[in-house]
From Swiss-Prot:
The keyword Cell wall biogenesis/degradation does not apply. Monomer. PANTHER family: DNA POLYMERASE KAPPA, DNA REPAIR POLYMERASE UMUC / TRANSFERASE FAMILY MEMBER. Belongs to the DNA polymerase type-Y family. The record marks 13 as: Substrate discrimination. Its cofactor is Mg(2+). Poorly processive, error-prone DNA polymerase involved in untargeted mutagenesis. Copies undamaged DNA at stalled replication forks, which arise in vivo from mismatched or misaligned primer ends. These misaligned primers can be extended by PolIV. Exhibits no 3'-5' exonuclease (proofreading) activity. May be involved in translesional synthesis, in conjunction with the beta clamp from PolIII. Transmembrane segments: none annotated. Mg(2+) binds at residues 8, 103. This is DNA polymerase IV. It comes from Shewanella baltica (strain OS185). Disulfide bonds: none annotated. The lineage of its organism: Bacteria, Pseudomonadati, Pseudomonadota, Gammaproteobacteria, Alteromonadales.
Length: 358
């Protein structure tokens, strides 16, 4: 059995800000774009989350939920520098590290001999080192497989850890919600629920041929995950294929003009996320996605080697041509990343381009 640790920093961007600016501690704090420019929240403190503030939420809506919210702009270079410190701590215990973002990663410690090979003690040591050297807390999940390690890291947040052993795994997955399985979103969960399938235990008892007939290849994945099977290894050289941002709207909107009003905040957040890239990558396409109130979605893409805000607005107009009177529930934009290592993709002269687009 493998020993997989999933490390997830606690409200990372906000935690760095509270570390560097003690006056923010204990207060509802968010890192994100200005509400005046229809920005979105990147992350927020636990104090803000008590009011319902969440990542990817429109900043203006966040202020409605929490009028005393403290909003600060992101300092991406600082977050990158701290992330490198954390990565160095990981490397003391294993070289099998799969970064998922600046603030989370998978580690395979199956061959680590420190602490007599105890993944539980190794995770404790890593979290202790992170706190001592960066002043930040991290949560951890330990399991024999990747997706369960990620599930476990969320169970004792903040500043805690949870262990799923080979012995406890069968009982743990029986009651695990299918929404915790990667690939099971809202629409798929509703389809599964209509069949009486809400937990992994439900899937275990269901007809496997029928699942495969209804869901095809994903049905096979669902059967495996529901038994706690995940053969995916740690991809130490894993590279992201795209960077994007999307927002679920508080209420459905119907016009192109309303969608255009949402775009500036998404563009600001996309610029932040592009600057997080660990490696310098060139883009090869831009994409706009719309999800309608009947849960169907459409995407429009354009091949490009540089980010153009005007092009995002053109793609939005093309996507809206497929609306057919339906309400828009979600709007997203993204860029595809090329394999070549070139310049960090940026969004040049953003406000000028916005003025032109609008």
């Amino acid at each position: 059995m493998r020993k997989i640790i999933h490390i997830d920093m606690d409200c990372y961007f906000a935690a760095v800000e509270m570390r560097d600016f003690p006056e923010y501690r204990g207060k509802p704090l968010a890192v994100g774009g200005s509400s005046d420019r229809r920005g979105v929240i990147s992350t927020c403190s636990y104090e803000a989350r008590k009011f319902g503030v969440r990542s990817a939420m429109a900043t203006a809506y966040a202020f409605k939920l929490c009028p005393d919210l403290i909003l600060v702009p992101g300092r991406m270079q600082v977050y990158k520098d701290v992330s490198l410190q954390i990565r160095e701590i990981f490397s003391r215990y294993t070289q099998l590290i799969e970064p998922l973002s600046l603030d989370e990663a998978y580690l395979d410690v199956s061959e680590c001999q420190q602490y007599k090979g105890s993944a539980t003690l190794i995770a404790q040591a890593i979290r202790r080192d992170i706190l001592a050297e960066t002043g930040l807390t991290a949560s951890a999940g330990i399991a024999p497989v990747k997706f369960l390690a990620k599930v476990a890291s969320d169970l004792n947040k903040p500043n805690g850890q949870y262990v799923i052993t080979p012995e406890t795994l069968p009982e743990f997955v029986k009651t695990l919600s299918l929404r915790k399985i990667p690939g099971v979103g809202k629409v798929t969960a509703e389809k599964l629920s209509s069949l009486g399938l809400n937990t992994c235990g439900d899937v275990q008892a269901y007809s496997k041929p029928e699942l495969l007939a209804r869901f095809g290849k994903f049905g096979g994945v669902l059967i495996e995950r529901s038994q706690g099977i995940d053969e995916r290894g740690i991809s130490a050289d894993r590279e992201r294929k795209s960077v994007g941002v999307e927002t679920t709207l508080a209420k459905d909107i119907y016009s192109l003009e309303q969608c255009q009003q949402v775009m500036p905040g998404l563009i600001q957040e996309l610029a932040l996320r592009l600057s997080r890239s660990a490696k310098e990558r060139k883009i090869h396409k831009q994409v706009v996605k719309l999800k309608f109130n009947d849960f169907k979605q459409t995407t429009i893409e354009h091949r490009s080697d540089e980010v153009s805000i005007v092009m995002f607005y053109d793609l939005l107009a093309q996507a809206m041509a497929r609306q057919e009177g339906r309400g828009i529930r979600l709007l997203g934009i993204s860029v595809g990343l090329a394999d070549s290592i070139l310049a960090v993709p940026e969004i040049p002269n953003a406000q000028t381009q916005l003025d032109l687009a609008l």
